Amino acid sequence: MKCVVNLQNMEPDTDERSLRHRVRERDKKVLRDTYKLINTENSPSKRLNMGYTTIYPTGSTTGHTHDDLEEVYFVISGEGIMVVGEEEFEIKTGDGLYVPPGVFHTTYQTGNLPLVVLWVTGRVD
C-alpha cells in the first residue's frame, strides 16, 4: 500500500506553541509550526512517523522524551542549538542527528532565519 502526502496539502498542529494559535490569541512570541506528514493514523506503518518543523526566530520546541521511540533529525535550513540529554551542541543546515529512546531533547532556533527540520521517529520494541 502506498502512502504519499504533500506538505502543501497539510495543516500544521494548532497547539499553544504553534504560529496559528499565537496569532489567534494575539500572542507576540511565535515559537514553531509542526506538520505530521506520515504517521500510524494516516499510513499503514505501525512504527514510523515523519514530520516537518519550522522554529521561528527566538523560538524553541518544548523539551520532551519519547520512551518508546527513537528519533532522527535532518536540518533543512537555519541554525540552532540542540540539547540531547546532558549534551548541548550547535546545529545547522545539512546536519543529521540521532536521539535515543527515553532521552530528553529540545531545540532552540538561534539565527536570523527560521530553523527547519525534518524528523522521523521509529517505535522500538
Spans of features found by a protein language model:
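Short strand-connecting beta-turns/loops that link adjacent beta-strands
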Residues: N42-S43, D68, N112-L113
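A short, N-terminal "cap"/entry segment at the start of jelly-roll beta-barrel domains
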Residues: M1-L48, T62
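Short, charged/polar surface micro-motifs in flexible loops or helix N-caps
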Residues: S43-K46, I55-S60, E79, R123
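Short, conserved beta-strand element in jelly-roll/cupin
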Residues: T53-P57, T65-M82
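Short beta-strand His + acidic residue motifs that chelate non-heme Fe in jelly-roll/DSBH
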Residues: T62-H64, M82-V83, V99, H105-N112
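Short acidic-glycine-tyrosine-enriched beta hairpin
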Residues: E86-P101
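A short hydrophobic beta-strand segment most commonly corresponding to one strand
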Residues: T53, Y98, L113-D125
